[in-house]
């Protein structure tokens, strides 16, 4: 792996008011101290590295800047005041930007996009977030996103994003990626690398009106209380590549309808004597299988068979009657 370029990308000058403050909602608070999320995208590109650097890279960088005008939380920082009575928030200043790394790799592109491979093959493609800094009164300033573009000459390239979940969920991130891709395509087709904003926007713009999220049950206050006493520095310095990933294979498994039915039948047979007949949904049996496989793959040594293991799944709430809006960055 050879790093070709390290730079910072920000929204166009004066395109976002400075400072801009975004309060966190009760949806966001639980993610404040969670490990960063990584998402990687692969693209075929059968050309040498120099061709990529001269043609595609300038378009990607210019279009990213334009995209960040509308998705500015990704170039912002998470602010955690030392005073536990002051809530964390997202802050954008006109000096803020995100880390953008360009690298070249001799890795086999076809292997990287194959279905079954060593999980460590992707690790060199993943950027780390820049280290947090400290402002006056010991306020912690934590970068929200870092991007790495890795070129595999004459075969393809990858774009990997490491980001704090507090700024966006999966739907918001994919909105960001689709928007960036659309602007890039627009710029390439028009052969125009200027930052002129006259071209029409390719997709719907995100909403950052977090004050529209209602919290009648006071969940935000409860979540904030749970954060008190948490040592953020331990997590901030944690290695994104865990030891549990050593000697592991990454593979996508697709369950057919017939296999799901067999699972349901097998579980029903096991449970009929002790629990009687129960309805088993596809979600329940699939989640149970995933849960079991995750625990086995982590090879955690348990002293007791009945040690508690949690399985957490996320749910979309944008279309509920109370929260019919676009959350976070999109």
Place the predicted regions along the sequence by residue.
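Soluble acyl-CoA-dependent acyltransferase catalytic core bearing the H(X)4D motif
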Residues: 11-19, 33, 38-73, 77-330
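Long, contiguous juxta-domain segments that are non-catalytic but functionally important
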Residues: 1-26
């Amino acid at each position: 792996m050879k790093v070709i370029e390290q730079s910072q990308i920000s929204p166009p000058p004066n395109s976002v008011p400075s400072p801009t403050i975004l309060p966190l909602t009760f949806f966001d608070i639980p993610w404040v101290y969670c490990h960063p999320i990584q998402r990687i995208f692969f693209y075929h590109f059968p050309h040498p590295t120099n061709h990529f650097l001269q043609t595609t890279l300038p378009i990607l960088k210019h279009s990213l800047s334009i995209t960040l005008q509308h998705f500015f939380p990704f170039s912002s920082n998470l602010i955690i005041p030392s005073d536990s009575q002051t809530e964390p928030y997202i802050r954008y200043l006109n000096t803020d930007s995100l880390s953008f790394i360009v690298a070249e790799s001799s890795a086999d592109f076809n292997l990287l996009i194959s279905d079954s491979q060593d999980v460590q093959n992707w690790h060199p493609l993943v950027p780390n977030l820049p280290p947090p800094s400290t402002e006056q009164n010991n306020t912690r300033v934590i970068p929200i996103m870092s991007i790495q573009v890795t070129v595999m000459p004459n075969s393809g390239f990858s774009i990997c994003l490491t980001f704090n979940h507090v700024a966006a969920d999966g739907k918001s991130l994919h909105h960001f990626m689709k928007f960036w891709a659309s602007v890039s395509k627009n710029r390439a087709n028009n052969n125009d690398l200027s930052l002129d904003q006259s071209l029409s926007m390719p997709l719907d713009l995100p909403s950052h009106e977090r004050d529209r999220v209602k919290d009648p049950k006071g969940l935000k206050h409860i979540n904030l209380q749970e954060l008190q006493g948490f040592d953020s520095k331990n997590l901030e310095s944690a290695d994104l590549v865990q030891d549990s990933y050593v000697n592991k294979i990454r593979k996508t498994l697709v369950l057919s309808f017939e296999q799901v039915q067999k699972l349901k039948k097998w579980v029903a047979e096991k449970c009929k004597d002790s629990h009687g007949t129960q309805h088993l949904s596809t979600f329940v049996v699939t989640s149970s299988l995933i849960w079991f496989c995750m625990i086995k793959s982590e090879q955690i040594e348990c002293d007791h068979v009945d040690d508690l293991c949690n399985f957490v799944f996320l749910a979309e709430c944008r279309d509920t009657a109370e929260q019919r809006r676009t959350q976070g960055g999109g």
